[in-house]
Amino acid sequence: MSELIKIAVDAMGGDGSPEKIIKGIIHNHSSNKENFFKIFGNEKEIQKYLNNQIDTKFFEIIPTDNMVKSTDSPLEGAKRGKNTSMWLSIESVKKKEADIVVSAGNTGALLVIAKLNLKMIENIDKPALSALWPNKNGMSVVLDLGANIECSSKNLSDFSIMGASLYKSLYPSETPNVALLNIGSEELKGNEVIKETFQLMNENKKKNFNFSGYIEGNELMNGKVNVIVSDGFTGNVALKTAEGTANFITGELRKALSGSLIAKISSILNFSNLKKFKKRLDPRLYNGAIFIGLDTPVVKSHGGTDYIGFSNSIDVCNRIVKGCLLYTSPSPRDAHESRMPSSA
């Protein structure tokens, strides 16, 4: 058996934990035997849900009864001490006992604890929260989705480097095509920070990724670009708007196809296509946001997802490690020049 990817798992974070976390691990392991899980949390509860469904050579339980609560502020979560499942799982990456960490817990606390334990990549000032979004041609990396409400032009330029690196690690055969989210596509549109960022990215673009200028909100999923950069406030609003729109569409479609006998017959005749459509809009299949900018990425699962969603966040961990994002980072000169790090 080849060397396994070691994934540290905060089993106590998120709604319905540790049950959904352990079920997510079991679901993922049923189709992927490349991972070794270091599971942090209440040992009795974890063993109950594992129920001997995974061979012990694929996991280890590190027991702790302490956890960060969803209601904690970021500082309250950090002050709960070094014995929480979240802290210990991140610390295991710091100690090189695991390759990457995933948690469905409190987002603010996760970022603070990660920054207390892990180093920032040289010349990167702020980490960014990134995620994969579906588009007409495949997937896009979008960042920042809420880690930084206010950003300088340098921060946004750094995000373009990190986002391009992440996309390249996940899709090695493709060239990252970066765009800056704005209220218009013309160069004169936007505030001063956006305009300064445009100039930085336009002047410093390198062959490692393409810069396509501005992109508007109605173009986020048209597939023309695959890395979209914004500040955390704008990105989070865009994310929540997209999620709400997807839920609205699926809800209205469900009502339309169950309102009459003809509609029900139509839904039966189009079952295969409707199933594909529903799957394409299923947020669980895109679960797994990534804090990048730290010397080891931290994967954040949505706290409200189910075991299938958590399983997908494990897949994200696996792909990040295999794509060598962990071993690539911009040097000071490269970061200033908006140059994407080469693969290890």
Indicate where each model-derived feature is located.
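A glycine- and small-aliphatic-rich helix-loop capping segment at beta-alpha/alpha-beta transitions
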Residues: 24-28, 109, 113-129, 196-200, ...
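Short, glycine-/small-residue-rich phosphate/pyrophosphate-handling segment
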Residues: 131-167, 284, 310
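Conserved small/polar residues in nucleotide/adenosyl-binding loops
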Residues: 327-332
